[in-house]
Amino acid sequence: RQNRHEASCRIVSPPVCGNELLEKGEECDCGSPRNCRDPCCDAATCKLHSWVECESGECCDQCRFIKAGNVCRPQRSECDIAESCTGQSAQCPTDDFHKNGQPCLSNYGYCYNGNCPIMHHQCYALFGSGAIVAQDGCFKFNDRGDKFFYCRKENVIITPCAQEDVKCGRLFCHTKKSECDFDYSEDPDYGMVDHGTKCADGKVCNSNRQCVDVTTAY
């Protein structure tokens, strides 16, 4: 047996134009004509004006498509490509970037998914502006395969770095504290060299933390 409250919840009210609720049959509802602040909406009918091309989006302004050529997503690095409005859509085109493996930052790195990952920037992110990449000798710790130094860690299985892959494991930085400073957490990827980072001339770290030829890495 239903109580009154359950029964009342099933009553469907007819749509009311002007109550600021988008209901069945309405394209918009911006309140009364006096209070409406939506230039795209005809407050009297709760329909969009006939000239409206769009209501929202990176390439929509005052209910019309922004002219073609206006940048809607700026270039975030030299590996990225700026996107511009097409004049035919309210949405910014799909994010695009230069080909993975293209040299960047004066050949200190290679493009990877729109960024140019290099160890120096990763040291800066971990330890601040005074940090630089440590000497090559520090990275040799990564062949130990212990709690801190490894190439892969999956559950309890720790895989040490092969000698040729040591620069794809734990990131080592030269700081005021130590010449071989590093950071770690319970997250097995924290403090590790980022995927796509240059590990030798013509080579980058792949997703398995192997230092492989840049032409086959992606």
UniProtKB/Swiss-Prot annotation:
Please list the residue ranges annotated as the Disintegrin domain.
14-100
Source species, domain of life = Eukaryota
Keyword set includes Calcium: yes
Positions of Ca(2+) binding:
16, 21, 23, 26, 29
Changes after translation: Glycosylated.
- Write out the GO cellular component annotations: extracellular region; plasma membrane
**InterPro entries of this UniProt entry?**
ADAM_Cys-rich (IPR006586), Disintegrin_CS (IPR018358), Disintegrin_dom (IPR001762), Disintegrin_dom_sf (IPR036436)
Q: What does this protein do?
A: The hemorrhagic metalloproteinase-disintegrin-like bothrojarin-1 is a potent inhibitor of collagen-induced platelet aggregation by blockage of alpha-2/beta-1 (ITGA2/ITGB1) integrin. It does not present any fibrinogen-clotting activity.
Its quaternary organisation is: Monomer.
Provide the protein name.
Answer: Zinc metalloproteinase-disintegrin-like bothrojarin-2
What organism is the protein native to?
Bothrops jararaca (Jararaca)
